[in-house]
Structures are given as structure tokens and as C-alpha cells.
Amino acid sequence: MLRFSSLFILMMAPAALFAQSELLITQSGRHDTSDSLKHLIFKEEVHSLASGSAADVEQTTLGTRGPAELIVSFEGLGYGFRGPQGESRHRNPSDNSLAVGHNHIIQTVNSKMAIFTKKGEVFNDTGRALYGPVNTNNVFRGFGGPCEEMNNGDAVVRYDQLANRWLVVMPIFRRLPPRDIEPEPRKHGEPAKESMVGNPGQPGSAEPLFIPEPPTEKELAAADSLRRIPRQPVPEGGSYCMCYAVSTGPDPFGSWNRYEFVRPLFPDYPRPAVWPDGYYVPTSTGDHIIQKHACVAEREKMLRGEPAKEICFIIDSAGFLNNIDLDGFQLPPDGEPNIMMATGGTQLRNVFADDGIYFWKVSVNWDEPEKSRLEGPEKIEVAEYNYLGDGQLTKTVPQPGTDQRLDSQGDKIMSRLVYRRIGNQESIVAVHSVNTTAGGGGVRWYEFRIDQQRNVSIFQQGTFAPDSSYRWMASPAMDKYGNIGIGYSFGGKEHFPGQRFSGRVAGDPKGILTLGETLLVEGEASQQNTMRWMDYTQTAVDPTDDHTIWYVGDYLKTGAEDYSTRIGAFRIGVSK
């Protein structure tokens, strides 16, 4: 859920970028525990493919390999979905998020969540709803405070394959009643300061995962009427918060550790990433200005169910940030920093084009958090690009039979920013949506490499635009063989919006998605009630084989009042 504030500070272009940012340390406001290959090393020499225009890297034909295998697909949350807790009733945008474990799949859509079966040791089928649709804040039932009481959307789910745990991150967008002492908003360049704890009595009481009864028609009608009540005035001086829930094992129906961190600034659009030393959660933040929070939560203590810290860097004049999210099981070199990236350009100053991707290195010191470091930004030169539709919240993608166009979120690197280590090779895969020479929209994708000195450089790049249709709002993954898979929305004047998948086999010619397109779901209707389309979506690599890539996205059914979602699993090449 994205918003522009009523007042803006115009953002400077990233080329003019900033000195090292200072750090905000936040103690957990509340916390409790609920009941209940071999390594393939590529020998191809790394070289820069950075120079040239956008057209130089544009792929104008489909790949000649066969498409990725669609192993299974099923209906997720959205219009027409019915599960143990009743029928889906959602709001736009969907804010799709997906996580895959060994025996379960969790999906969150805006303010709702569901748990599905995954064929394996426990279940003999995939895609059967075990839980949901329920409000995402049910994970925090019994915890108390705003994490339990509020449910405004933008919740994101991850599976931490290194520990076999689930992670749910949920922001609170409403200011809370003022406390006796409130944390002061931090500004870029100010000295580090440890923030207050939200509840001196933490950890709170332990409760099992709450499983509600299906709502009655009367309760559903009451919920619909509440949506139409104007929002009450915001209390002056109160803070927001970020809520974390980490399961104590691989069964999502088991117990969870829950945490609340006080945020003095609005915590929009969280994008969690798993890294050995923390859960990295950047947000777009601020109330009357646009800043970025680059935050990290203390993963090891969360996994042990202990009180934990969250530290935040405040960054001015940057695009939407993403931290690298670890795919697979091979760890990065011990103690190496996480890397965070953003596109260039500045929509607020009408700068929609750039020829660089910008990155920072984040080094966390949990023993002495004030010594944590944020280094950067540094520019990686890439082929020129222009934001698809000139950025976010713009009417961009046409649809059949209507003048309503869809938003493309063209100003940002999309979730996830993927990290994969294979032997001594360390890769980062990123995607964003760009204009194309054919007049539609394309998926610009990159594979970066990290050398032994921790320098980041471009290895290959391309813009997938095989025709004049629109391909946008993508999400990438890399499997254990180094194959790259990308799911994305597909549509245009002649095609209702739906979801497709493509990719490439490791070692294929650089800059080309060599696979044909796999259809996940064909759109059946145009979305006419809003321009908002998903805001983001998500891939997930299956931890069971580290090869299968899962993806989720929106589409509309014939006669539907609102979006539906489709979840699918793809495999590139043959399992070895």
C-alpha cells in the first residue's frame, strides 16, 4: 500500500547522493511466544554490459527454448475464494505475498492471509486451504497492543529456509495514542539514538495460533459497513509500529514469537529479506516528507524467542529500497554485509530516466549497534531506462473495453532482490518495469556479481519486450543451478491482465530470457474499479528441492467484482 504525503520535499537525483547515514536503534516494544548439489561454478568471464541505450538490451523476440514446466497451480485469496473461515472479501491493491515451506504455503493479500497444503511428507495434495481467509493480525492474537488490535494491510510473509521458520511482517499505519514519552522522529545525518521500548512488561503472554470460526452473514455485513465509516482524526503526537511474528518451527499452526517495534514515522511498503545476521525490512517512511527507513531486526534472538532489537538507518533522497534476500542454503562469506539497491531517477522531480542502479552495504553490529554501518550509495552503470508510465500511481497499462488503465509501479526495483551463492559465485538478480521501443512495457532484469573485494558489477542485463504488449510488476528467483525465473503481469489493449512466467538456463547467451512464456493464468476481464494493480508480487524458491520456483499474481474472472489470485509452481530444466 503506497501513498504520497500531502507535502513533499523534492528528492535529489541519486548521482548527488548522500554521506553515510546515521542509525536509529529500536528496542522491541513487545515480544512473546505463542503456544502450541553439487555447487555449479560458472567459468564464463565477467564483463560489463553497461554501456548503450535502452534499445541495445531490448529482447524483441521470445526465447527459443521450450517454456518452463508448470507443475501445479491453484486459486489463492481473492474474489470467489472460499476457505475454512469463509469467503474472501478484500480491498485493492492486493499487495500479494507468498511463502513456501516443506509442507505448507502461506499467502497474504493486503489485510488477509491463508494457509494451504503442499504435497510432501504431511499432505498428499497441494493447494487445499487449511486456514483462511482470516485477518493477518490473527497471528498476533493474545499479544495485545496495536499488532493484535489493528489490521490495515501491507503484511508480507517469508519462509526462512535456513532455520525452517515462517516470518510475518505487518506495519501499523495509524498513529497510536500518545505515550507518556514519545520517540522523536530521526533525520538523516543525526547522531544515533536508541529508541524506547513500547512495553516495559514484554514478553507478553503466550497464545496458540488463533483459528476463528467462519463469520456469519451479519458479521460480514457489519464489517462492510465499518469500511464505509470515515477514518477518525489522527491523535497528535502518537507513533506507529512494525510487527514481527516468527514461528518456532516449520509448522505454521504451531507457536510464534511476536515483536512490536515503535516507529515514529509512517512505515509504508515493507519488503522483508532474509540474511544470516538479520531480517532486513526497508520501508518508505515519513508523514510530511518522503524518506526511507533501512531497518534490520535481530534474527538470531527472534529465532530463540528472546527480546530483540531493531536498528534503522534514515536515508534521504533515495528511491524505493530493497535488500538482497537469500535464496538457497549456501551462506555468504562470514560477516559480509547485506546489500541494498534502488533505481535512479526521481519521480517527484519529474526525472523518470537514469543509467544506473545504486547500492549500499549494510553492516550490523548487534553488540554495539551504534557501530553498525551504512556505506554508499555507489552507482553501477547499466543501459539507460525510463520508468514504465513515468513511475508509480500513474495510469499506464491499457485494458480491453475500458479507458481505465493500470498502475505499473515503474519507479522501483520490485520484490524480491535475490541473492544466490553457488560455489564461489555470488549473484544478485533484480527487476523493474520500463518503457519499450515497441510502445508497451517490459521487464528490465539484471544479474550482478559480487567479487572477493565485495565490489558489485553488472554481469548481464536485458529488457524482456518480445512484442508491444505490457509485461510489468515482475518478481525474480534463481534456483540452485543458476537458472533465473521471472513471474510478471501481462496485458494490454488486446489482452485482459493476467500472469505469465519466463526465464533462462544458466550458461545461455547473456541478456536473453531464453525460455518461451509459460501461462499461469489468462485474464478474463478488465479491472475497472481502480487503477491500482497488486503494488507488488512475489516469487519463492521451494526449500524441498531448491529448484522449483513459486509465483503468485492477480487476474480478474468474468463478471467478477474484484481481483482473484493464482498461485503456481514452475521448474526450469530437469531435476538432477
Language-model-detected regions and their locations in the chain:
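C-terminal PAP-associated
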Residues: Q20-V197, G201-G204, P208-K576
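Bacterial Sec-dependent N-terminal signal peptides
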Residues: M1-Q20
